[in-house]
Curated annotation (Swiss-Prot):
Positions of the UniProt region annotated as Disordered: 1-47
HAMAP family: Ribosomal_uL15
Name listed for the protein in its UniProt record: Large ribosomal subunit protein uL15
Cross-referenced InterPro entries: Ribosomal_uL15 (IPR030878), Ribosomal_uL15/eL18 (IPR021131), Ribosomal_uL15/eL18_sf (IPR036227), Ribosomal_uL15_bac-type (IPR005749)
Species for this entry: Bifidobacterium adolescentis (strain ATCC 15703 / DSM 20083 / NCTC 11814 / E194a)
Keyword set includes rRNA-binding: yes
Pfam (any one): Ribosomal_L27A
Signal peptide per UniProt: none
Keyword Transmembrane helix on entry: no
Subunit structure: Part of the 50S ribosomal subunit.
Annotated family: Belongs to the universal ribosomal protein uL15 family.
Gene Ontology cellular component list: cytosolic large ribosomal subunit
Keywords: Ribonucleoprotein, Ribosomal protein, RNA-binding, rRNA-binding
General function of this protein: Binds to the 23S rRNA.
Length: 148
């Protein structure tokens, strides 16, 4: 019966593994300069990353970053009352899900209603924030806004 090939029987193909080049071990094999060329800084030691030969480095030429990014900032999707009047001309109760269904906003982001435009119908907005002008226009038309 033939032997089954096993992991410990595997070995690299002939010539696949070369010996590493041992530099600096005599003139016959990469001796003397060890592949670093003649003279100069890079022959003697390594320079730090970002070193430009004495020229003012890029990280010092560029301006410093000012301020900071607030990690708790809330980005609202805005909808104007004119858009509400266009999408819901009959008025009624409007939720974020209704706005998503009509394509006015994307799902998963908070919504804020702004006061650009005119309101003719009474809207009951739920789960949205509203600017002062939007709130006054909606309430003047007989509507209401709740943020919960």
């Amino acid at each position: 019966m033939a032997d089954i090939l096993q992991m410990h029987d595997l070995k690299p193909a002939p010539g696949a593994n070369k010996d590493r080049i041992r530099v600096g071990r005599g003139e016959g094999s990469k001796g003397k300069t060890s592949g670093r060329g003649d003279k100069g800084t890079k022959k003697r030691y390594q320079v730090r990353p970002g070193f430009e030969g004495g020229q003012l480095p890029l990280y010092m030429r560029l301006p410093k970053l000012r301020g900071f990014k607030n990690p708790f900032k809330k980005e609202y999707q805005v909808v104007n009352v004119a858009v509400l009047a266009e999408l819901f001309p009959q008025g009624g109760e409007i939720t974020v899900a209704d706005l998503v269904a009509k394509g006015a906003v994307r799902n998963g982001f908070p919504v804020k209603v702004l006061g650009d435009g005119e309101v003719s119908a009474a809207y009951t907005l739920k789960g949205v924030k509203a600017s002062a002008s939007a709130k006054s226009k909606i309430e003047a038309a007989g509507g209401s806004i709740s943020e919960d």
